[in-house]
């Protein structure tokens, strides 16, 4: 089947729209699907995603589409950008509508709810072995990407030719640099764990602890990410790159991060429900914390920061209690195994 679009993006939230804007601005006809017809109608009418990215015009090559079948028939390249807790359901909806030559990439950051499985495993369970898979991950705030500010990300997947084609689609000398990576597992994990650590950094700043504590959390958070990654077969070096250290620093230090702002609200004394309401959009790290904690417990991997964030979010703990528990841990050597 011939393509009528270069790529289809599933998910018309802030990040999906930002990636679609970047692709269309790069000269590629891009279909953007969203599950709410009224939202898509507003995108068409306003030529702007006023709900998530107000003030940023949609390029002419970006075509909003409310019908999933039409969107998936338009291109064999499918970019999924939906929250991790609906990733499986969106793939299940898409499966009977996918073209035989479809190739699937996602920019979703997270693991499967309840099980803590990588999204690669979820995709294979639903779609089988037929379709090439890839993941896009790295330090990206949607608003900056949509505005054309310089951004760098990493990409990994199961098919070399698919990766090459994606790099050609995504790369822009003016706005987006794409690094190829051969660690499919590592890129998927980094995007989930960094959200958990960002919540901890926000809680620390909300309490008023300052830059020293924030930096310690980022550094030890990187240790936790690497430890868990190596336990599931990822390459430790991956976490020194865009999808590890890069995403971790970005999300922990800038208030554009919903996860960091969520943590700030908790640190200032708000309860979990009120803090989420204050953010007003999906806080991926809330679910990611449970996913990462579940995976770490299943594998017997020690992740003290993650454990304390989990206690605050799901067991009624407080940020002050979490800080006391972390500072009161037994002394040990600062090594990769500590």
Curated annotation (Swiss-Prot):
EC number of the protein: 1.1.1.94
Active site per database record: 194
Catalytic activity: sn-glycerol 3-phosphate + NAD(+) = dihydroxyacetone phosphate + NADH + H(+); sn-glycerol 3-phosphate + NADP(+) = dihydroxyacetone phosphate + NADPH + H(+)
Cell location: Cytoplasm
Positions with a binding annotation for NADPH: 14-15, 35, 109, 142, 258, 282, 284
Pathway(s) of this molecule: Membrane lipid metabolism; glycerophospholipid metabolism
Pfam family for this entry, one: NAD_Gly3P_dh_C
Any one biological process term the GO annotation gives: glycerophospholipid biosynthetic process
InterPro entries listed in its UniProt record: 6-PGluconate_DH-like_C_sf (IPR008927), 6PGD_dom2 (IPR013328), G3P_DH_NAD-dep (IPR006168), G3P_DH_NAD-dep_C (IPR006109), G3P_DH_NAD-dep_N (IPR011128), NAD(P)-bd_dom_sf (IPR036291)
Keywords: Cytoplasm, Lipid biosynthesis, Lipid metabolism, NAD, NADP, Nucleotide-binding, Oxidoreductase, Phospholipid biosynthesis, Phospholipid metabolism
Enzyme class: oxidoreductase
GO molecular function: glycerol-3-phosphate dehydrogenase [NAD(P)+] activity; NAD binding
Superkingdom as given in the UniProt entry: Bacteria
Binding locations of sn-glycerol 3-phosphate: 109, 138, 140, 194, 247, 257-259
Any one annotated GO CC term: cytosol
PANTHER family: GLYCEROL-3-PHOSPHATE DEHYDROGENASE, GLYCEROL-3-PHOSPHATE DEHYDROGENASE [NAD(+)] 2, CHLOROPLASTIC
Functional summary from the UniProt entry: Catalyzes the reduction of the glycolytic intermediate dihydroxyacetone phosphate (DHAP) to sn-glycerol 3-phosphate (G3P), the key precursor for phospholipid synthesis.
Record family assignment: Belongs to the NAD-dependent glycerol-3-phosphate dehydrogenase family.
Protein name: Glycerol-3-phosphate dehydrogenase [NAD(P)+]
Organism encoding this protein: Shewanella sediminis (strain HAW-EB3)
Underlying gene: gpsA
């Amino acid at each position: 089947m011939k393509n009528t679009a270069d790529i289809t993006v599933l998910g018309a939230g802030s990040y999906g729209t930002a990636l679609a804007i970047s692709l269309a601005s790069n000269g590629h006809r891009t279909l953007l699907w969203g599950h709410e017809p009224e939202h898509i109608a507003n995108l068409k009418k306003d030529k702007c995603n006023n709900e998530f990215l107000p003030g940023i015009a949609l390029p002419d090559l970006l075509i909003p589409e409310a019908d999933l079948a039409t969107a998936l028939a338009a291109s064999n390249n499918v970019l999924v950008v939906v929250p991790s807790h609906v990733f499986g359901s969106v793939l299940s909806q898409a499966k009977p509508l996918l073209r035989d030559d479809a190739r699937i990439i996602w920019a979703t950051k997270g693991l499967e709810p309840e099980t803590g499985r990588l999204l690669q495993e979820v995709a294979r369970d639903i779609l089988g072995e037929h379709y090439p898979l890839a993941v896009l991950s790295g330090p990206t705030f949607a608003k900056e990407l949509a505005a054309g500010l310089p951004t760098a990300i990493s990409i990994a997947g199961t098919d070399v030719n698919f990766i090459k084609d994606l790099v050609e689609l995504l790369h822009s000398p003016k706005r987006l640099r794409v690094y190829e990576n051969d660690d499919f597992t590592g890129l998927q994990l980094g995007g989930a764990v960094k959200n958990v650590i960002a919540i901890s950094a926000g809680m620390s700043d909300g309490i008023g602890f300052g830059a020293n504590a924030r930096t310690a959390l980022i550094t030890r958070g990187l240790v936790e990410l690497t430890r868990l990654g190596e336990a599931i077969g990822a390459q430790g070096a991956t976490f020194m790159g865009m999808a590890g250290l890069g995403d971790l620093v970005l999300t922990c230090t800038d208030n554009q991060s919903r996860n960091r702002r969520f943590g700030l609200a908790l640190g200032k004394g708000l309860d979990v429900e009120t803090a989420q309401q204050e953010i007003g959009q999906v806080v991926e790290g809330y679910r990611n914390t449970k996913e990462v904690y579940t995976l770490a417990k299943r594998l017997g991997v020690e992740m003290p920061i993650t454990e304390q964030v989990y206690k605050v979010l799901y067991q009624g703990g407080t940020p002050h209690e979490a800080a006391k528990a972390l500072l009161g841990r037994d002394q040990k050597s600062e090594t990769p195994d500590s």
